[in-house]
Amino acid sequence: MNDSDKNVIRIFRLFRQYPTEQILEIIDGIIDRYGLSDSRTNGYAFYQCESARGLGTYNKEGYNRLRSELNNMKRRNDRYFFMLFTLIVFAFNNQIRFNEKREFNLPVGKRDFNNNMRNKVRHFAEAIKNPHIELSSNDFRRIPFDGLSEHSLIYADPPYLITCATYNENNGWNARLEKQLLAYLDRANDRGIKFALSNVLKNGDKENTILTEWLERNPMYIRHDLNYNYSNSSYHKKDRSKHSTEVLITNFE
């Protein structure tokens, strides 16, 4: 498992290192310390909030205090990454973003550490402890095909070139990298290695022509259109007619 964001891999390693129930206890302790909501226990009415509008108003003060203390920490130790993960749970759309000063700078989101999120963490923390899973934070262009075969599968989930997601601000992912990733997958295909690529073909009036032309040049690749509902996300488009076309592209049935 590889991610270019070293913070993500550090959190994964933390989840591998600590017993699952201890992870949950530490997160609960941070939530309690900063006075963040616990809708799993208390429900929404306790915080004078409705599910549709979310918990952002209630959590804003505690969230900002947690974020400020995290950004002032000198050591990036286990405590830092548990606090960072808790921020992500309460952040806008559960995303991660740092500014040029390496400060986490996302605003508070609508949700908290509810039952759904808690179960996801529990299941992931158990799965990541599998000793066969290797963790790395390398440039994808430097990941060799050594050891991979026709029984292997490469799953690529890059930042989406034509969206304005927080993880792709400041031109973190560009056309050159998009082309290099597609060329990397072509080389994998030439070696008989299976791949699956998550991406966006259209987003409103924008089209990922690099991806479209790549599919046209490679008719053997299979496009699977995905239909996701992001009704619980913190961001809602004003013009819902301008939808996004998300796809999974594979070189196998």
Predicted ranges, named:
Residues 1-129:
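Class I S-adenosyl-L-methionine-dependent methyltransferase module
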Residues 1-6, 12, 85-92, 138-139, ...:
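Conserved proline-anchored active-site loop of SAM-dependent methyltransferases
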Residues 22-23, 133-138:
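Conserved SAM-binding strand-loop segment of SAM-dependent methyltransferases
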Residues 100, 104-111, 160-180:
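Mobile active-site "lid"/loop adjacent to the S-adenosyl-L-methionine
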Residues 120-134, 183-196:
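A structural motif corresponding to the C-terminal end of an alpha-helix
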Residues 132-133, 152, 221:
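Short, conserved active-site loop motifs that form the nucleotide-linked donor/cofactor pocket
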Residues 143-148:
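Short conserved loop adjoining the S-adenosyl-L-methionine
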Residues 161, 170, 175-253:
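Long, positively charged, glycine-interspersed low-complexity recognition regions
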